[in-house]
C-alpha cells in the first residue's frame, strides 16, 4: 500500500516538474527540488527531515517494472548546496526555439515581446493613426511664409533725429547771451513815443553791462524789458501818428466844406 502511494506521489511530482520545464518558469508550488539522485524535499523544518522520497535514477517507460525505485534518505547538510547550485539567482537566457515552444505549449502563462525595426517614418513621410505611411516629395512640401516690411524703425529714427535737433537748438538758445535790442530801442526813441524809447535804450545798455559781467539772469531780464518797452513805444507812436493823420484829414475836409 505504501509503495502504491509513493508511486502516485512520484508521478504527480514528475508531471509538475515536466510542466515547470515546459513553461520555463520556476514552479513555486512544487515543494520538491530535483537533484541528480532524485527528488529532495525543500522543507527546512526538522519534522520533515525524516520523510523519505523515492525516485527513479534511470528514465524508463511506465510499463517497464524491471527495477524497483531506489529510495534514499534526506540529507539536510547537502540540501541547501544542491538547491543553490541548481536554482542560483542569475539572468536566465533561452534560445528562440525554446521560447517558441513555450509560446505554443502554454499561451496563458507567458508572453513574448517582439521588437520590429525600420518602422520609424523617414523625413519625407508621414505616419497616420492606422499605421500607414505616405511618402512626400520635395514638390509636395510647401511652407507658407508671411513677410512684411518694418517701417516703425525708420519712423522712430526720424522722430529721434527731430527730437535731438530740437533739444540741440534749445540748448544753443539757452547758451546764447541775451540780446540788447539796441536798434529797436533807438528806432522807438527817435521815431515813436520817445519816453518809452529812451527807457528801452537804457535797458539795452544794462543788458550789455550784465553780459560783460557774466550775470546772465540780470541780462535776460533787462533784455526782455527793453524789448517790451520798445514794442510798446512803437505801438503808441504808431497810434499817435494814425490819430494825428485822421484829425488832420478831418480838419482839412471840414475847411473845404465851409
From Swiss-Prot:
It comes from the Eukaryota. Residues 203-228, 250-258 are extracellular. It is found in: Cell membrane; Early endosome membrane; Postsynaptic density membrane; Synapse. Belongs to the CD225/Dispanin family. GO terms for cellular component: cell body; dendritic shaft; dendritic spine; early endosome membrane; excitatory synapse; plasma membrane; postsynaptic density; postsynaptic density membrane. Signal peptide: none annotated. This is Synapse differentiation-inducing gene protein 1. Residues 229-249 dip into the membrane without crossing it. It is a single-pass type II membrane protein. The keyword Hydrolase does not apply. The modification Phosphoserine is found at residue 137. Keywords: Cell membrane, Cell projection, Endosome, Membrane, Phosphoprotein, Postsynaptic cell membrane, Signal-anchor, Synapse, Transmembrane, Transmembrane helix. The keyword Phosphoprotein applies.
